[in-house]
Amino acid sequence: MKKGIHPDYHMIDVKMTDGTVFQIRSTWGKEGEQMALEIDPLAHPAWTGGTAKLMDTGGRVSKFKNKYAGLGF
């Protein structure tokens, strides 16, 4: 591989919605930083069978529902 053209690949901490933390190698952030997830397999309806509540960050879900209200979504 050529030197100096690839991003730094280092260890970061990932914090799940339930508070658990695990380490993973990534190009995100800097060595030792923590990435806090808003949606993960524990809180996403696709993996929970619809039992988890979807968080409306930025009003995107509300905007979608209002835009397509007449279609029965």
Curated annotation (Swiss-Prot):
* Domain of life per record: Bacteria
Q: Which InterPro entries match?
A: Ribosomal_bL28/bL31-like_sf, Ribosomal_bL31, Ribosomal_bL31_A, Ribosomal_bL31_sf
For this record, the Gene Ontology CC terms, alphabetical, are: ribonucleoprotein complex; ribosome
Q: Which PANTHER family match?
A: 50S RIBOSOMAL PROTEIN L31, CHLOROPLASTIC (PTHR33280), LARGE RIBOSOMAL SUBUNIT PROTEIN BL31A (PTHR33280:SF6)
General function of this protein: Binds the 23S rRNA.
Into which family does the record put it? Belongs to the bacterial ribosomal protein bL31 family. Type A subfamily.
Subunit composition?
Part of the 50S ribosomal subunit.
Q: What is this protein called?
A: Large ribosomal subunit protein bL31
Species source reads Cereibacter sphaeroides (strain ATCC 17023 / DSM 158 / JCM 6121 / CCUG 31486 / LMG 2827 / NBRC 12203 / NCIMB 8253 / ATH 2.4.1.)
Phylogenetic placement of the source organism: Bacteria, Pseudomonadati, Pseudomonadota, Alphaproteobacteria, Rhodobacterales
